[in-house]
A protein has these predicted regions:
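Conserved short-loop catalytic and cofactor-binding motifs
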Residues: 4, 24, 136
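Glycine- and acidic-residue-enriched helix-capping/strand-helix junction motifs
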Residues: 1-9
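N-terminal active-site beta-alpha-beta segment that forms phosphate/nucleotide-binding
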Residues: 9-90, 95-100
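Conserved phosphate- and dinucleotide-binding cores of soluble alpha/beta proteins
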Residues: 94-212
Length: 212
């Protein structure tokens, strides 16, 4: 990464972490992806079952492979043999020990913004798993809550629609059409502004570009 861009991440990143701590998130700043992987492993007890939503960041980090190598019990919907088994695994994930996810956007004052189609990912954030570990690159951090919501709707959602080949307006044009299509992946827009169960939600901010 360009040295100047790296400074643009490393200087404000810890301030956003401090803002998150005031909202009762257990938050950390890692300058590199490698550091973030080690921090995530440190936060996940070996006795936990671990699952995740459809999350590019975790894939990019190679964290799933590390968890498998370390002998964790994984609830992986991608191993399902048919749609019924996939649904069963997704329900099982809602009561796992640790749920891994990223965030579509984050405001500088520490609020997490997530858009979801089926709702399983935001459901896990709100309630169910013993803890949630959110890993997000600094490219997801925006100035205000409104900025973060705009990023989630106008950048993350269209990019994910194209990633999954979904024929919504944003999937076809690259721009949000504020649709209510049957295939809409923006059914739920959730702002997590506080962790009521203190430190249940853990956030690792990474000084690199990760995810969409």
């Amino acid at each position: 990464m360009n040295e100047n861009k790296k400074k643009m991440y490393d200087l404000p990143g810890p301030k956003t972490v401090e803002a998150m701590k005031k909202r009762h998130f257990d938050a950390y700043y890692c300058s590199t992806a490698a550091e973030a992987v080690e921090k995530a492993l440190e936060l996940i007890p070996k006795t936990d079952s671990v699952s995740w939503g459809g999350v590019m960041t975790v894939d990019e980090l190679g964290l799933k492979q590390r968890l498998a190598q370390e002998g964790y019990t994984l609830i992986d919907r991608d191993t399902a043999k048919d749609p019924a088994e996939k649904q069963a695994l997704m329900h099982q994930a809602l009561s796992c020990g640790t749920f891994l996810m990223s965030s579509n956007a984050i405001s500088k004052d520490g609020q997490l913004v997530n858009i979801d189609g089926m709702g399983n990912r935001v459901a896990a954030m709100c309630y169910g798993p013993r803890q949630v570990v959110v890993i997000a690159g600094m490219n997801k951090v925006l100035g205000t809550l409104d900025d973060a919501i705009a990023r989630a709707r106008n950048i993350a959602a269209p990019a994910n629609a194209q990633r999954f080949g979904i024929k919504t307006p944003c999937g076809l044009t690259g721009q949000c059409g504020d649709c209510t299509s049957p295939d809409c992946i923006c059914s739920y827009v959730v702002v997590t502004r506080n962790s009521m169960v203190h430190e249940r939600i853990k956030v690792i901010l990474v000084g690199e570009d990760l995810g969409l």
